[in-house]
Amino acid sequence: MTITANGNPAYFTKVEEVVKAAPKLQDWKFTTFVQPQHAYEELENGLDKPYVFQDITLKTSELKFMPFKYNCEKKIDMIVYLKNFTLYSHNKNLLQLIYFMMQDLLGEKSLYENINFVELGQLPDEEKNELICMYDLQYYLDHLNSQPL
């Protein structure tokens, strides 16, 4: 059973307390927060399953990002680039889907401890070297968090 704070940092401590106090039950495992769901190798090779939501179909392996601000709380602001942003930009659920995909990639706690703001944009026709594959986001965050401010 996963106990979640639904991304609300105000409840992170409570979630940890509940799981710590949970009774030991046969065949039950209590887990704090939504955990990462992807195998890195599948993402790197483009073998991940697409997320399909209403008229949107996206694969994490096809997303790129560019951080543009890093604050003193060790949180980044970033732009997530999509191949078909112009096609999907009218959909009010697009940003929510991107956050859901990032939660599957990073896990609930890491997402809300490390990401401050997400903007969406069209992936350029000529891919720039400074864009980072979305599946490398956790590695990028780990590197940032290992550096002194």
Model-predicted regions and their roles:
Residues 2-6:
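Short hydrophobic/aromatic beta-strand micro-patches
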Residues 7-149:
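Long, contiguous binding/interaction regions
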